[in-house]
Amino acid sequence: MGEKDKLHEISSKFASLGLGSLKSTPKARETTEPPPPSSQQPPSTPNGKEAASPSALKQNVRPSLNSVQQTPASIDAVASSSNVSLQSQQPLSKPVVSSKPNQTTAMPPPSNNPSRHVSSTSNKPAAVSPNPAAHHAELPSGSVPPSASVSRANSTATTTPHKAGVVSNPAAANVHVLSVAASPNPSTPSNGPAPVSTTATPSRNPVTRLQRIFSQNSVSRQNSRTGRGAAVANTEETNSTGGSETGGAANSSSTSNPSSAKWSRFTVYDDASHTHQLRPARRQEKLGKMLKDFLAGNSKKREEERIAKEAADAQHQLSLVQSWINGYGQEKLADKKDPAKVSASFVEKYGRCQEVIGRGAFGVVRIAHKVDPQNSGSETLYAVKEFRRKPAESQKKYTKRLTSEFCISSSLRHPNVIHTLDLIQDGKGDYCEVMELCSGGDLYTLIMAAGRLEPMEADCFFKQLMRGVDYLHDMGVAHRDLKPENLLLTVSGSLKITDFGNGECFRMAWEKEAHMTCGLCGSAPYIAPEEYTESEFDPRAVDVWACGVIYMAMRTGRHLWRVAKKSEDEYYSRYLMDRKNESGYEPIEMLERSRCRNTLYNILHPNPTYRLTAKQIMKSEWVRSITLCEAGNAGL
């Protein structure tokens, strides 16, 4: 039989099998054509002869197989390259059609070397890789290459050997295949198909973006409370100090006993009541251990010092000169304000300052530990805020600023307002404000750790916040800098307003009308729009606006906008447009209850004249229906 007849027999078997398995390997025709201009030589057949060229094969193969571009290799290599795809006798998947008919998708430039690439057009069956070992060398024999099924399902697949700028490893090639198939109009650079990202292109529609940003599915920490038992949120497995977080924000328990979980941040019971268990930060836990070790070491040290002092006093009891020197020194210290004496007075009243637990723009907050030996060694913790002078601030302005803040905060007595105890000047001449310690941290840290809060949890904190703001306004004080960082929490969930550095007294006790104010202060996302104008405004309305933004931050874990200026923030501009429409503003419309949504629209009214007051908010149906925790009701 001649070589032409042998080749005809091979072609007939290809046509009859329809890309089926080949049981025999006929002898390939010897070629006299010179090798292609490539450093790689064409592979040989098992008998040592060179394989037939692709052009010779194409002349005798039926037109339906023209889309399969074969590199010079033996037919056994072709059969083994499609290990499962050819042996399974499954029909090809429907090819992916390009957006333009008969258009080549991600086609690389032509090459003189037939082993450079194997590609297919968008309206033809997918290409089959001729050499499985070239791209799947790590796969065991008999396994399916990851790209085999992908190539048959996605007719736009293109396999390119390794070169600069082109992915050649199997994992990267699979991602590239999926990316090209998903893209309707992939770009084709001059050096081959460019890698296409699998990430969906963000929509330019602002409404779609708002849905994506504020949707519950986009929040990293999901809420999934099921069952009728106690809903437990934020178990102990959650790492609140950063890094990867395991588990969701909410886990369910089939029992109403919260002790069944290791630790739960927020627990809801069958009777609709709830409890907060805000664990102190790890830094505070470390501080507590350090304080215990410190006290244990100090007690031993004090005992040694007492014994040494008694021994020294025994030696000097008979010395009149030493007695006179000691008395003279005490009189001199009493005649002047010695920094050491001031410091000793502070330590005597509130203990020694320890680790820094908070930092601000012009000061730090430390923790002070006081042991009362007369009361069975009871321990009391205080928060000490150390004020620093601003750059180019005179001593007179510095003193006036601190005394003004202290006068405002020390005159307030409310469960939701921080209790300020004292203002003392330390040995360096800086003033220190002593306050009660809230070991639960601040609201900002809680939101950052949880992603977002549970609806009942956020409602409880919001009602406590509005109750404190209503009290401040009744006392004639506006805070002017409300934000989650200035809202402290106890371990049991009691919220307290702090930092009255920007506070204003808009009405004296004997006055009935409130004084208007002007000027810009606070943090940008919480500043009301009227503060950017040059006209005067009511400072109470500014506090109400900030409370609305804080509530949305608790529910969504995000800011509604960067700045409440229509010309500078597209999200705020979209809010002004959507709040007039029937569909409403998407982040607010995602909230479940209509009473909550309506109240928030009135809290965030751009015109302060029509904005709700704190007292009106407390009397609204939504806020009256909110159930507070036991700690939130304490002290009322």
Swiss-Prot record:
A GO cellular-component term linked to this record: cytosol
The answer, when asked if Cytoplasm is one of the entry's keywords, is yes
Gene Ontology molecular function, alphabetical: ATP binding; protein serine kinase activity; protein serine/threonine kinase activity
Matches recorded under PROSITE patterns: PROTEIN_KINASE_ATP, PROTEIN_KINASE_DOM, PROTEIN_KINASE_ST
GO biological process: one example? intracellular monoatomic cation homeostasis
Where Phosphothreonine occurs, residue numbers? T238, T241
> Can you name this protein?
Serine/threonine-protein kinase hal4
Q: Which organism is it from?
A: Schizosaccharomyces pombe (strain 972 / ATCC 24843)
